[in-house]
């Protein structure tokens, strides 16, 4: 990148007039990624925010948002919503939008980080799990941030380019990480573009994207995302609802919170997995033959510790977050299909041989944990460890004890474990359903623990 790019990237025609009217040929010489930016053209930018950040943008009594409207002669709004997300809408020319974003970014908070920027040597404790990183802790603009841009689904191809050439070039020229989520936001035609990096770079990247999509007409129907239709079962790259137990209120956390900006090979079937910030590729888990049902992580893991099995569940109260974990290990699965009234999953799997354990955790003949990543920091979850995938099966008659009425139980398990959990429909002629779990090793073991407890507690109570 050229040393003068920051000046070209963020011109201020009011205070630095010498940069306000630069010849087009100079801009092309200075920046390899050419843009046909028309500063007089009004465009609309929509950014997906955590609801808790709306107050910082609006300010007390609307002071901040009024100042942005007045100072930049722009339309700026953050409509209210009942969920963990809101949309920041800015209508102005592209250069002005960039200046407004530079004002807004330092006021935002990022979800679920260590309580101190320097506390990177250990995992957060349970009491720290709801702490957030406020960008205001940093001086200047030398810190990493990320924004979620909303675009119409028909515009995605213009950003990706042929075989990903455009998005690759955009990453290289702006020195940002970019992920275009595959699934649309709930009940809409919008897709999320997650852009991360230094604030100046992120803003420059957004300006280039706005320039790209402003030249492309929208194809098909347009249904902008309404955050009131928030639905966490959609893996679209938004924010997930979690609860701050100390304050008794819902807060939003990034759905991406478990992965990085990398790519995962396409899978077969299923919805893209939310825990990873992959590329624009399909992020569905790899599917393999149904393994036999696993037992509780404690005895099972110790029995076959030389195989790629999840470790025992952490001690109660020692997890990243504290939850009511009813149905303690050892409780019986009353009425479970395939087991007698006096038999548990644990007692059944204690008779498994090492080869049976290996078969249970090795779909497609490889490790049950899917280490699909491509360099960089991308494949590692924000709380430590790579993003991995494993599969288990349950008798289809027990699926209701996990899913719950309206899917509430499985949603809660996703919230508590931090893992992505997908339950496939049973194959024709099969009595089992495959559960695919994706996340860090800790998230997977917590998810398995909660799934088993749910079966124990609700077996025989179908909804």
UniProtKB/Swiss-Prot annotation:
For the modification Phosphothreonine, which residues carry it?
39
UniProt keyword annotations, A-Z: Acetylation, Activator, Cell junction, Cell projection, Cytoplasm, DNA-binding, Glycoprotein, Isopeptide bond, Methylation, mRNA processing, mRNA splicing, Nucleus, Phosphoprotein, Repeat, Repressor, Ribonucleoprotein, RNA-binding, Spliceosome, Transcription, Transcription regulation, Ubl conjugation
Listed PROSITE patterns: KH_TYPE_1
What SMART domains does this protein's entry cite? KH (SM00322)
Compartments annotated for it: namely: Cytoplasm; Nucleus, Nucleoplasm; Cell projection, Podosome
Q: Omega-N-methylarginine (modified residue): where?
A: 316, 377
Q: Glycyl lysine isopeptide (Lys-Gly) (interchain with G-Cter in SUMO) crosslink - at what positions?
A: 422
Pfam families on file: KH_1, ROKNT
- Record-given protein name: Heterogeneous nuclear ribonucleoprotein K
Name of the gene encoding the protein in the UniProt record: Hnrnpk
